[in-house]
Amino acid sequence: MEIKMVGMKPGERIEFSTIEKRPNLTLSDGGRIIVWPILALEVWNIDRAMARMVISPPQGEPMTPDHPNWSWHEYGMRVGFWRLKKMLEALSVRPTVTLNGRVCDDYPEVAGACLDAGWEFNAHSYEQLPMHKLDNERTVIDRSLDVIEKFCGKRPRGWFGPGLTQTFETLDHLSQAGIEYIGDWVLDDQPVWAQTTHKPVAALPYNYELHDIVMMNIQNNESHIYRDRAMDYFNTLYEESTDGHPRVIALAMHPYLSGSPHRIRYVRETFEKILSFPGVVCWDGEQILDWFAKQIPA
């Protein structure tokens, strides 16, 4: 049965805090930057409108089933994922894998490869449907966590909403279901605590600027822009981090975009360049959560 809640707006869940006037977070050995690599794995149901499009339908008419865009995403699971996996393993980068629970059912080889690699499993709902369009939000959350836990033997601690969507009640449902952190908010360079009707949930720093969907699918930038923008972004935060406030930089990847042949080079160069700097660590979401919670308890 769906639990009815009043809900809270984000500003009611978090305290306003400027980065210049808050307790310092510290990284060992003078660390300054945490890189948070995120690999999103999704299921696009061909019976519905596609989550994203690389090609618009003829005459602009809605198209269902949408074979062209469905197959574009399918390439990511058949080829792009494996290209990214080889790159990440060669660089000793262990990403947070945020996946629709249905990936475990529809693409068990892909999910199994992540499990064998020891990567963190983060819940991304059951399939790629926006949270604010669900009639049974809590039921879908529970199903997502249950399916992933059954597959990997561990319940996810973190969550990304499909398309970063939420309702005013989502965080309350997530906290009651055992979720400890979310990645849906892009409001800071450091983690923050968000209050819920149950236990506080940490909002880890995410961003749109270094998101492959935003850069490559919405803004239609050339492939090298991924690397160039990431380095500009990193250089600024690296310089600022001398103030005693380590920053978090999230790098979001989708196999059908970042795993394409003409982009993988620039994704690899981004990680190589950033990780070559002293004082930079590469952590998954659980590591960032534990680091933050130990120094600034909820």
Feature roles, as predicted:
Residues E2-A202, D228-L251, L257-A298:
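Catalytic alpha-helical scaffold of carbohydrate-active enzymes acting on polysaccharides/glycoconjugates
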Residues P205-Y238:
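A conserved mid-domain beta-alpha-beta active-site/ligand-binding segment of alpha/beta enzyme cores
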